[in-house]
Amino acid sequence: MRGPFRAGGHDRRSLAPRRTEEEARALFALQAGPILERHRRQSLEAVMALKARYSRPVLGQVRVWELIERLGSCIDPTDERLFGVSQQVHVRQILAAMEEDGTATPEMVLVALVHDLGKVLLLTGEDPANVVCMNTPIGQAPAGSGLANCVVQWNHDEFAYDRLKGLIPDDLAWLVRYHSLELPVSCRVMDAGDLERTERLLVPFAHYDHATKSPYVLPSTPLEQYRDVVEEAFPHPIWF
């Protein structure tokens, strides 16, 4: 079989111009922009429609560990800090940092493992604008009315919360539901309970969720090390 055509002794494919990282990041940001804008403009009607659409299971009954494995195929097209690294690697980055800092309590390990499970919607054809991005309350809810009494933009947080509530402690379910909440802009509508959970849970977790993201840090600890944690918390398949 004839090999690839060579010009001047070089494979012609190697002569194709390569983007610098700066150019690649600029293209990434350009592609992310419209997604972020669509999410920013998400209306009350759109949120209600998404809630109705996803009131039923999408994948049927599935083991939570399998969902975590599927995160290996999920790429957030708007996350410039991860820059194409999978959500499963992101989970491992969080866990590695917690272990290093001595903050890997059983509760924080569990929420790190499951907080982004809703991003499997990226594999179903759903518009990424309805899956990723940060959230804020929609409209002008009274100050201190409580997050549960507000309409918040819809994304993977709410999808996963609806599947996990009742299966994990209430505090952790709350954290899954609101881990993408923009702070401090969303604090105005929080009630006393929300504010307490924000200080105790959301702020510490957000530190790891955001600060550990990198396309260059690939933790050596295998995810399999945490399988027993997942199987103990979810001994049976769940509707997802």
Where are these regions (language model features)?
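Acidic/His-rich, divalent-metal-binding segments that scaffold phosphate/diphosphate chemistry
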Residues: 2-144
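Generic detector of well-ordered alpha-helical segments enriched in charged/polar residues
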Residues: 25, 29, 33, 48-52, ...
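Divalent metal-dependent catalytic cores for phosphoryl transfer on phosphate-bearing substrates
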Residues: 83-220
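Short linear sequence elements within intrinsically disordered, low-complexity coil regions
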Residues: 33, 59, 210-213, 231, ...
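Histidine-centered, transition-metal-coordinating active-site segments
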Residues: 2-13, 168-171, 183, 216-240
